[in-house]
Regions:
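Conserved small/polar residues in nucleotide/adenosyl-binding loops
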Residues: 184-189
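Histidine-centered catalytic micro-motifs
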Residues: 47-64, 161
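Histidine/acidic-residue-rich catalytic or RNA/ligand-binding cores of hydrolases
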Residues: 167-177
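A glycine-rich, hydrophobic loop/mini-helix early in the fold
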Residues: 59-98
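Glycine- and Gly-Pro-enriched alpha-helical subdomains that act as flexible
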Residues: 87-129
């Protein structure tokens, strides 16, 4: 399947969508195909999905009921220049990605408004029985990782399967608090 599409003038779109397969998903993913009936075939699919499945956005609404949903975020949040940082196996497994690690990996490439995608060679499909076990060797994020993104005015951050974003509350909460609260919401008056 082609995932890169040329737009002209040197611009391209790269589709990062992970396919959803109800047979292999570990979280709620049910697709019910049916024909509405009548003389003309009219097929539809009823979907019963959890919001944290496949390619998804951690939107402000996920963090606070009073904050914007994905539908309220500007589409431009998810479009633009992107930097892919693949640490491969250059960092020890289960290491928190530090500001120094990101500085070294990006070496001045990051610009204000960029999208940052972080990955490593320690891949593991998320949300499986192996998540957060000894088999899970992925790199980790925390408040320091998030603060680096905010300090460098990253507008959107994404992760490959080589980075764990839900290893423990002590890391997850600060990461979400800093990125979601500071990147997507306005301070209260």
């Amino acid at each position: 399947m082609n995932t890169t599409f040329a737009l002209g003038n040197g611009l391209k779109v790269i589709d990062l969508t992970k396919p959803l397969d109800p047979k292999t998903e570990s979280r709620r993913c049910h697709l019910i195909r049916y024909n509405t009936g009548g003389p003309i075939p009219d097929f539809h699919t009823a979907m019963d999905l959890t919001s944290h499945l496949g390619t998804h956005c951690e939107c402000p609404y996920h963090h606070d009921d009073n904050w914007p949903s994905v539908a309220e975020l500007p589409l431009t949040t998810f479009m633009g220049r992107a930097i892919y940082v693949d640490f491969k196996d250059t960092l020890p497994h289960r290491k928190h990605i530090s500001a120094a690690d990101l500085d070294k990996a990006t070496e001045g490439w990051v610009k204000e408004g960029d999208i940052l995608i972080i990955d490593s060679s320690y891949k593991l499909a998320p949300f499986t029985p192996d998540t957060n076990t000894d088999k899970d060797q992925r790199l980790l994020v925390n408040g320091e990782t998030a603060q680096w993104c905010v300090d460098h005015k990253i507008k959107c951050v994404g992760f490959g399967d080589g980075v764990s974003i839900e290893n423990c509350n002590e890391d997850v909460k600060p990461f979400h608090d800093i990125c979601i609260c500071l990147l997507y919401t306005s301070p209260s008056p």
